[in-house]
Amino acid sequence: MARFRGSNWKKSRRLGISLSGTGKELEKRPYAPGQHGPNQRKKLSEYGLQLREKQKLRYLYGMTERQFRNTFDIAGKKFGVHGENFMILLASRLDAVVYSLGLARTRRQARQLVNHGHILVDGKRVDIPSYSVKPGQTISVREKSQKLNIIVESVEINNFVPEYLNFDADSLTGTFVRLPERSELPAEINEQLIVEYYSR
């Protein structure tokens, strides 16, 4: 299944979550798109709830179904709670870390920065968004890329960096200090529904 490339605004409203991370999609119209959006009261089945939760998280991270399922399966082989391990693995992706450091305003921008070779991990260029960052590794911006408007503007307006990360705005360098705790990750996601979806 290909990565979704349609309107993130419509998809955000349908799923009830900001896929861009800015929240603008839901400010004026916090309901599903379409003629009957504000009045839709259709009750989802158990399967429908599980599917919607899976889609919310998959679209949030901009992943294909295969990438998403593979990450889910890897999480299941780790010690601990499957759903929490899954959320932690997603938050450890390089594009997710770049976004959380404030180097990009949206996850899509963060993915593009990685794809285009603007990001370094421990001083070496890594252009794979799904690269799993390990505790202690440093994430920085290539010297030639440090004046890109997308990066400069993102850093200027960002006023929050999660506690599992350290970030120096002057050098545009961050450190993945430790694995995040579940409480530090998206609260609007019920990962147990996703576990149930894939356990059918």
Curated annotation (Swiss-Prot):
CDD domains per record: S4
InterPro entries with a match to the protein in the record: Ribosomal_uS4, Ribosomal_uS4_bac-type, Ribosomal_uS4_CS, Ribosomal_uS4_N, S4_RNA-bd, S4_RNA-bd_sf
GO molecular function, one term: rRNA binding
UniProt keyword terms in alphabetical order: Ribonucleoprotein, Ribosomal protein, RNA-binding, rRNA-binding
Tagged with keyword Magnesium: no
GO cellular component: small ribosomal subunit
GO biological process, one term: translation
Domain S4 RNA-binding positions: 92-155
Signal peptide positions (record): none
Assembly notes: Part of the 30S ribosomal subunit. Contacts protein S5. The interaction surface between S4 and S5 is involved in control of translational fidelity.
Homology family: Belongs to the universal ribosomal protein uS4 family.
NCBIfam families cross-referenced by the UniProt entry: PRK05327.1 (NF003717), rpsD_bact (TIGR01017)
Role: One of the primary rRNA binding proteins, it binds directly to 16S rRNA where it nucleates assembly of the body of the 30S subunit. With S5 and S12 plays an important role in translational accuracy.
Protein name as it appears in the record: Small ribosomal subunit protein uS4
Protein's gene: rpsD
